[in-house]
Amino acid sequence: MKHCLRFSLFIFALSASAVLHADTDAEVNARKDALELAGAFANDGFMIRDGYSCGMLKPHDHALIAVNLYAGNQYWFSVGTVEPLRKVAVSLYDETGKQMTTENFSNGDKAAAGFAPENSGQYFVSVDSVEDQEGTFCLVYSYK
């Protein structure tokens, strides 16, 4: 009975912490910019995937986000940033760490990378702080 009660309290604490996490203003603004950029790809038939990934980048640092991609699809990974972080680079790696060739876009506080995998599997999107700035970023991606 004690173990059941402890387990129930543990699950309650985990669910409460997930519910209590609220997006910061910086995350909301970065996501707005990322969605604005992804919307441009929607004009070409890309559908924006549910979900997003936000975080903080330190100067000359990077964040890795794991994604599952499917052969035959095309993808755009769109990133929005919030000042003082102004310039980021978006790149893609396969599960062995090999950098993939992507079509790149960069304009002010937004950047994107386009990719069409030959093989289905797990890939890693890298969001890199290019300059001596830190701040919040948000990644969304589109597919068709």
Question: What are these regions, as identified by a protein language model?
Answer:
Residues 41-57:
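Glycine-rich phosphate-binding "P-loop"
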Residues 21-46:
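Predominantly extracellular/luminal regions of secreted and cell-surface proteins
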Residues 23-25, 52-136, 142-144:
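Acidic, Ser/Thr/Pro-rich low-complexity intrinsically disordered segments
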Residues 1-9:
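Bacterial N-terminal signal peptides that target proteins for export
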Residues 2-3, 20-22:
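N-terminal targeting/docking segments
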